[in-house]
Amino acid sequence: MDLDIEGNVALTTASSSGLGFASAQALVREGANVVINGRDGDSLADAKADLETEAAGDARVVAVEGDITDPDDLDRLVETTLDEFGRLDHLVTSAGGPPSGAFLDTDDEDWEAAYELLVMSVVRLARKCAEPLADGDGGTIVTITSRSVKEAIDGLVLSNSVRMSVVGLEKTLSMELGPDVRANAVLPGSHETSRIRELVDQAIERGEYDSYEEGLADWVDNPLDRIGDPIELGNTVAFLSSPRAGHVNGQAIVIDGGGGSSNL
């Protein structure tokens, strides 16, 4: 399916690896120009090089190093995008997860840091990007959150609680920014990202598993009996960003292979 986004401009955060990278990958394969972001300059440069090998047509990749919890870095990220391309069509927000832990093991600083990372980064970007997105022909926002907003996950009180605000924001944006801008969220379960691979490798080194395949199998928790491929989520993000999903708005879409037990 041609998503009809060739030549569009997409800004993707936390996109030097993981699900943010997979989203940028899917977009650039469709011919969209992408601006990627990350805190580590070396990882960002590697991601840029990888994406450029997959870019369709005349699509360009621009890398902007920065911390999404720093308002000045976010301003520079958006300004660079507009300076480079003169437009913005799609915003894809992603962020690393807050630390795991039980409620009584957290303090005020943990909650404030999680809110800055997961919520305020999206708030600031959406505020900064709303006007250029509306100026185009069908702007979109896709927020990558977690299926923990549907079902609380043991030991992840910060993610379970704070990410709910992101979904509430996304729904509100879908109402307030329409009809010029659509806003949706994707709620991933486990995907075989570099972080998961790292955790499995560490478990093998501790002697918990004999092989990578054995360790990865412990992350499988769905009827499809396999962990997700990051590009499967990336393809969904690209679809939601495209006019092919032109009547999909204000939705929070779980991408977990059917692993959740929630009816809604």
Predicted features along the sequence, with ranges:
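A conserved structural motif in NAD(P)-dependent oxidoreductases
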Residues: 207-212, 221-233
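Conserved glycine-rich cofactor-binding loop
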Residues: 9, 14-18, 40
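Short C-terminal tail/terminal secondary-structure segment
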Residues: 151, 237-238, 249-264
